[in-house]
UniProtKB/Swiss-Prot annotation:
Subunit-structure text: Part of the 50S ribosomal subunit.
Function: This protein is one of the early assembly proteins of the 50S ribosomal subunit, although it is not seen to bind rRNA by itself. It is important during the early stages of 50S assembly.
Matching PANTHER family: LARGE RIBOSOMAL SUBUNIT PROTEIN UL13, RIBOSOMAL PROTEIN L13
Swiss-Prot/TrEMBL keywords: Ribonucleoprotein, Ribosomal protein
Name by which UniProt lists this protein: Large ribosomal subunit protein uL13
GO molecular function: mRNA binding; structural constituent of ribosome
Gene: rpl13
Biological process according to GO: negative regulation of translation; translation
InterPro entries reported in the protein's UniProt record: Ribosomal_uL13, Ribosomal_uL13_bac-type, Ribosomal_uL13_CS, Ribosomal_uL13_euk/arc, Ribosomal_uL13_sf
Source taxonomy: Archaea, Thermoproteota, Thermoprotei, Thermoproteales, Thermoproteaceae
Highest taxon listed in the record's lineage: Archaea
């Protein structure tokens, strides 16, 4: 896996780029992605490893905020029927963050959102392609500080919807075995 460090100005004008989200702060990466999608109308962006995105803040506080946001609109007889649909999976959470940064009510914003794909882990067809890291990973700076507080989107998902997370984790283990067979590792 080849990782390059690039700034936004050095991104190509057209084509497809793959961004490895491992260790990035979710909001900062989302601003880069939203800006690139709006400035370059023929550029497609694929974000992989969305479950490894980081949200800064106290772990308990972040998880409670997500739980409150989800349960605020629920009704007792059908939790998903009324109110806005709040995503729980890390890939959908990140896409929702980017959607909030785009002008989704006009054509430009809608087309930008259509050109964004977000995956948890790395799909097999993108395994050997170049992946970009847009800037110095801020998580490395956070780990140096002993009292730095952050939580990954996977941890948030595990605390919100354990059954779905557990099912994904089992599928992920099978997927890793399959990748090892294909790559011969």
């Amino acid at each position: 896996m080849i990782i390059e460090k690039r700034e936004l100005e050095q991104l190509p004008e057209r084509g497809e780029i793959i961004i490895d989200a491992d260790g990035h702060i979710a909001g900062r990466l989302a601003t880069y992605v939203a800006k690139a999608l709006l400035e370059r109308p023929s550029l497609r962006i694929v974000v992989v490893n969305a479950e490894k995105l980081v949200i800064t803040g106290d772990r308990k506080m972040v998880i409670e905020w997500f739980k409150r946001k989800i349960s605020e609109w629920r009704t007792h007889y059908n939790p998903e029927k009324a109110g806005p649909k709040i995503p729980r999976r890390p890939d959908r959470v990140f896409k929702r963050i980017v959607r909030g940064m785009l002008p989704k009510k006009n054509m430009r914003g809608r087309s930008a959102l259509k050109r964004l794909r977000v995956y948890m882990s790395i799909p097999l067809e993108m395994l050997n392609r170049k992946k970009l890291v847009l800037y110095e990973v801020p998580l490395a700076k956070l780990k140096v500080k002993p009292l730095a507080k952050f939580v990954t989107l996977e941890e948030v998902w595990r605390n919100i919807d354990f059954a779905a997370w557990e099912q994904w984790k089992r599928a992920q283990e099978i997927w890793q075995k399959r990748i090892k067979q294909v790559t011969g590792g």
